[in-house]
Amino acid sequence: PQGFFPDLSYTQLYIEFKMPEGTRVERVESDLASIEDYLLSRPEVTHVTTSVGGTPARYNLVRSIAEPTMSYGELIVDYTTPEELKASMTEIQDYLTAHYPDAYVRMKRYNLMYKKYPIELMFTGPDPAVLRELTEKAEQIMRDEPAITLVTNDWEPMTPTLMVDYYQPIARSVGLSRSDVGLSMLAATDGMPVGSFYEGVHAKPLYMKSVNSEGEKVEALDNIPVWSVLPST
């Protein structure tokens, strides 16, 4: 498809690599290292820079910026010529898709006009099951087209959800809101974000966590202490 601005004729592109949320960072680093070795084995590739956790800082403005997460990584790839870059993209994309089936891997060239995907299709409706069925049918139609090299969707993997039985009359009598209960659960599990500090240009998040008397994570969620954020009277 044509865009308002064509892709830049440049000797560099970047590769987005995204594993499902919750994937160990060691797995991400290992896969990125093997991809880097593969790319450097190709004669048209001159240099590869790898980043884990997000888009490298102070990079450039003619590209998309990824949301920070330790399940994400990037490879910035330099080529001998723009022509070699363009000629090798389909072969490399096919290799990455075949060898890393658990990951979302996409090669992207630079463009003055940001576009997430060359072709996008959106379904809306109240029933997730119907939406998933329509998505699968549309994906199959696209995969049957030889000119299309990558088909994906924005459905994230289903994950367990912790639900709290909040009984408002009793909670109000002791001054506890839904937010108080939610923050206490967050502190006992992943940790409640309370700030950040910087190591150079890199921001590191700070979390407050509830622990037992021995400094260990609280195992029984029924025993989590809950405090109100409002001062007591």
At which residue positions do the language-model features occur?
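Solvent-exposed, membrane-proximal periplasmic/extracellular interface segments of envelope transport
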Residues: 1, 27-113, 169-190
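Helix N-cap motif at beta-to-alpha junctions
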Residues: 21-22, 80-84, 127-128, 168-171, ...
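Short beta-alpha junctions and helix-cap segments that line functional grooves
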Residues: 2-3, 60-64, 118-120, 191-196, ...
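A short beta-strand structural signal in non-transmembrane regions
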Residues: 14-16, 72-90, 120-124, 204-208, ...
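Beta-strand-rich non-transmembrane domains
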Residues: 132-233
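Transmembrane helices with small-residue packing motifs
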Residues: 1-21, 104, 118, 145
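Extracytoplasmic
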Residues: 10-14, 43-47, 70-74, 100-102, ...
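Short, low-order "capping/linker" segments at domain edges
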Residues: 61, 117-127, 167-169, 208-210
